[in-house]
Amino acid sequence: TLAGVEVLRRISAQYNGKPPVTVRVVDWADEEGARFGKSLFGSSACSGNLDMDEARGLVDQDGIKLPDALQKVGIDFEKVKDCGKELEHAAAYIELHIEQGPVLLDRNLPLGAVLGTFGVERHAITFHGQAAHSGSTPMDRRKDAFLAAARMSPEIYKIAERSGIGVCTIGSCTTKPGIVTSVVADCRITLDQRHLERDKLATMHAEAMEACKRFASEAGCTVEWERLWHIAPAPFDPDLVNFCDDAIQETCGVSHRLPSGPLHDAAEVCMAGVPTVMMFVQSLHGISHNKIEDTKEEHIAMSVEALDRLDESDQPDELTIDEADPDTLGGTGDATDDDAIAVAEAEEDELDGLLNALTQ
């Protein structure tokens, strides 16, 4: 939030409070899905991609439904998609974010230009074998579902390596009957696959399915797949990526282009048809969502400077910005409906931030 505000302060000072375009800072609601388990809630409502039926049934850990929580603060859930009008004339969207990974750290670089966000194929895979006594069943007579599932672990590393920049993760594994004296009858694993290119993501998925069938057959088992979630890759605007790369090089002397494995609000804005780019700041330890998550202050300062440079290079003849705090930020109200919109994104998990984003 502060980075976007600082950029707007510079713009306001440069144009004596009357910039030629409107620039807004948007504070998206519940990117992480922290309260209701639905990621990208605010941005998906704005992009029009929010599944209203699904969101209507979301419940927090206290049993409160999302529509009821919104109603308590005066927001009609059935109208949340109305905020999509804020993107109707948007010319550009810029988002600054920590990398949440080790790529920039390993290269000893403070900042990076983001090529886009990975598409995701997420499935539950269940291998079906036969329960049998662990003592009386010879090894060559077993139909061990866990054996078939376990063979997938090294295989997904080969699949990811063949794809180039793709990643594959088996994140969970459960067995039945789950007792020490029985061969595993059923083994369920979850597989998360991600890639920036749609075709390569499809290839990774097809290779994983083929491997599962092969390993199941070799173990005397069967296998079934259940899609848990899918989202297409969101490649960012090439011109904006170039501008971002230039701004970083002007600030730091060197830049690096990388994809984003995690999803971000920028993906929703991009899929809504708005030219989009992200800038990453190095994460210390290459770790996020952990108590040791941190970023160097000097890198944060560089990111604000680079964001400011990017905003200058990206401004069209006329421009609009989404205001998180109209009393603080630039923008004169002189812009017309044909104005462009450049948005510097700020991350906030509290519901108040979500509601603010939806109602601005």
Protein language model regions, located:
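Flexible, glycine/charged-enriched surface loops at secondary-structure junctions
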Residues: 16-22, 80-84, 136, 157-170, ...
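His/Asp/Glu-rich mid-to-C-terminal helical/loop segments that flank catalytic regions of hydrolases
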Residues: 115, 133, 137-163, 205-210, ...
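Solvent-exposed, non-transmembrane alpha-helical starts
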Residues: 200-204
